[in-house]
Amino acid sequence: MARSIKKGPFVDEHLMKKVEAQEGSEKKQVIKTWSRRSTIFPNFIGHTFAVYDGRKHVPVYVTEDMVGHKLGEFAPTRTFKGHVADDKKTRR
């Protein structure tokens, strides 16, 4: 279910403060965050976030196409190793 339009998009305050602090500086550092639930705003474009996936921080560079999505969508939490191959051919 989508979030109510009345409420507006959600972003953690501490994350917004970190982005606004870097807006004035020339050198953009990687912003480390655990907030996977935060919505990507237009002023996040061009910044790199290190989003926590449960084990490590995954670098996510924000582009125009990502606006409106959540940060957690771009840092998968599960590693897919592939299905086990069928051994019927090798048993014969």
From Swiss-Prot:
One example GO MF annotation = structural constituent of ribosome
Q: Write out the entry's keywords from A to Z.
A: Ribonucleoprotein, Ribosomal protein, RNA-binding, rRNA-binding
Any GO BP annotation: translation
Please give the GO cellular component terms listed in this UniProt entry.
cytoplasm; small ribosomal subunit
Q: Is RNA-binding among this UniProt entry's keywords? A: yes
Q: List the disulfide bonds.
A: none
InterPro entries registered for this protein in UniProt:
Ribosomal_uS19 (IPR002222), Ribosomal_uS19_bac-type (IPR005732), Ribosomal_uS19_CS (IPR020934), Ribosomal_uS19_SF (IPR023575)
Query: Does the record carry Calcium as a key word?
Result: no
The domain of life is Bacteria
Functional note = Protein S19 forms a complex with S13 that binds strongly to the 16S ribosomal RNA.
Q: Which family does it belong to?
A: Belongs to the universal ribosomal protein uS19 family.
Q: What is this protein called?
A: Small ribosomal subunit protein uS19
Which organism is this protein's natural source? Staphylococcus aureus (strain NCTC 8325 / PS 47)
